[in-house]
Amino acid sequence: MAEMEKEGRPPENKRSRKPAHPVKREINEEMKNFAENTMNELLGWYGYDKVELKDGEDIEFRSYPTDGESRQHISVLKENSLPKPKLPEDSVISPYNISTGYSGLATGNGLSDSPAGSKDHGSVPIIVPLIPPPFIKPPAEDDVSNVQIMCAWCQKVGIKRYSLSMGSEVKSFCSEKCFAACRRAYFKRNKARDEDGHAENFPQQHYAKETPRLAFKNNCELLVCDWCKHIRHTKEYLDFGDGERRLQFCSAKCLNQYKMDIFYKETQANLPAGLCSTLHPPMENKAEGTGVQLLTPDSWNIPLTDARRKAPSPVATAGQSQGPGPSASTTVSPSDTANCSVTKIPTPVPKSIPISETPNIPPVSVQPPASIGPPLGVPPRSPPMVMTNRGPVPLPIFMEQQIMQQIRPPFIRGPPHHASNPNSPLSNPMLPGIGPPPGGPRNLGPTSSPMHRPMLSPHIHPPSTPTMPGNPPGLLPPPPPGAPLPSLPFPPVSMMPNGPMPVPQMMNFGLPSLAPLVPPPTLLVPYPVIVPLPVPIPIPIPIPHVSDSKPPNGFSSNGENFIPNAPGDSAAAGGKPSGHSLSPRDSKQGSSKSADSPPGCSGQALSLAPTPAEHGRSEVVDLTRRAGSPPGPPGAGGQLGFPGVLQGPQDGVIDLTVGHRARLHNVIHRALHAHVKAEREPSAAERRTCGGCRDGHCSPPAAGDPGPGAPAGPEAAAACNVIVNGTRGAAAEGAKSAEPPPEQPPPPPPPAPPKKLLSPEEPAVSELESVKENNCASNCHLDGEAAKKLMGEEALAGGDKSDPNLNNPADEDHAYALRMLPKTGCVIQPVPKPAEKAAMAPCIISSPMLSAGPEDLEPPLKRRCLRIRNQNK
């Protein structure tokens, strides 16, 4: 064979890029014999008698007329014939194109009226018995051409070596290998069609004119695969089907392909007719009557209702082809079927069905139009299938899932106050199957598009429009209880109840649970859909104290009471450790201290919405009054009677009950860890005194009994104030109110964990130190601005640290009750009375750690504080 290729090379090749080989003009005897033997061997394989080469001089098949027109030279093989338009391969190879491949097979072909083996070229034609016997004719000199072609078999570009005349078309091949493979495929297909009993599909004259069959004797019975139409000499044919017609497949691969084809056809038949356009010609002849349409990009623009209303008669569908059909393939490609399945689960997009037109259509009705019958070969009673991400699902089950989804989260549908037709089931944007997939909006009223429907789920709303209480209720249901509003760092004050603020109200705004907001897992869409899910933003919240019924929100134990620092200050909801307010001096010190310690030192939440301030103030005052009304425990050293200086806050001063202290203790604990080291510094001593003030002892050192460790009166007061949140006003109030008598011993005056230990006479100082650690935490929160605001608040407090109130034991407790958030507002921090302090000490981390806890606790505490401070930095 290689010699033939060499012989066939034209002399022009010498000038071409490839080296030329000598060209022989005649086929030698050896080649003729080889061709004859090979041909006969092949014929024997397929059960034909052998053919003698001599018989091919002027072959006239007895079954065909001899006149030039009707005598079809079926396929004439020429080497290097002149280029002719070649038939695309798919029209020949695809099983669906059997009829098209042969439709023009023999029309008008025939090289000339004279026999093909004319003596002009002095060669004898060789019969190749594959399709019909083609005639091999050596290339004439004028026929020789060096033409670049794309091989009809391997689809590679190369020099044309062989061409096969297929009726009006000529197939060109780059090598003998491709040529032989193509001939073999055609021969098998022709033979299969002849023996398969498909003749009834084609008129008899069709055979006579187009595919003259070889008049050879068929020696054996052959089975033909019903899918690939190939003849396989195998006993392992797979039978499929039941009833009258049984199909035979040569392999499991063919069987599976057949099943997939049936499935695709079923899916198409169940699609609304309008969604699939007949871009592609009907599949063979048998698909013509089914009216099956394929999905195309243009079908997105068809209103779903129009598609359902149209009865797709074959005539209408045939004339409907929408848009250009670039692909000429007649098979159903998986992508087409995928598109078909997509239409069953469209996601809501701007354009949707006119709601007013389809009040009675269920949201996901994809029942096949009555006029579309299942394609041939499909069992008539099999339920239609819907493609989903999990594979084909029977349509009834799919519909049931959709209905369940619609029923399950009823609140998602919400009041369709923006929809034109409230009764329409299409107002639920979360359900699939409601609107057609994306496309240009049609001339529908704006009310029908999901964009204008109420956004019924917080996921769909852009988080840039947080719902404040004034917004219309239907727009955005409040987010789930665990998730804060999208853009608010803390719940707005207006949403907080004015009273004692029980936790349930704060934490539960009557919000629906999160579960129904999450789309059900059965929602399967073949393409990604972006569903914004609320991401919880961490908000520091003090550890809820079991003993207190007060809000475990971000508020410290003192959080119940908000004391407005300045009109602009917002309530300090989250500041636990810093319950004291600072006098102006203290504010300065506090600011410096705060600079020392990172603002995040304590667990307080510094970022509160400014709006809550006013609310917080009123709430705080009420709470403080409530707490302050009961007289302090006997150990307190006096009831909570403040001189007129602190009247408003006085009334509001909260009893420092054990519960409060427990909260403070937790809060302080966090803060203290960060600041324990600071105590050693001189400022630390001040802080301790401040802490003492909190306890009610700090001011005594300042005013009454300056402990050695406690700064002088003003200094001590200042220190105390500083330790507090760093808000001077609050601290000033605290100083005024808190006049811890030096005689008052702190509940456990035991030396504070800090290295500086206070003598029993300095119990105030020691307590101050312990408190101070707590205060340090609060100081961490203080910012420069906070100090300024504190000064303003101090003015509000209208008292000096030196005020007689400082000397009042009851006041001393309350002085610490005022807690300041850095910028938000003053929170009254309940200071336990001296007697209570002992009980409180365990509650307040600073006090238990410093006063109650032995010194041995100090090193671990300090280490812990250092670690926390570093982390905060």
UniProtKB/Swiss-Prot annotation:
GO terms for cellular component: nucleus. The modification Phosphoserine is found at S629, S699. Residues 318-339 have a biased composition (Polar residues). A zinc finger (FCS-type) spans 142-180, 216-256. One of its GO terms (biological process) is animal organ development. The keyword Metal-binding applies. GO terms for molecular function: SUMO polymer binding; zinc ion binding. Implicated in development of the cochlea. Belongs to the SOBP family. This is Sine oculis-binding protein homolog. The lineage of its organism: Eukaryota, Metazoa, Chordata, Craniata, Vertebrata.
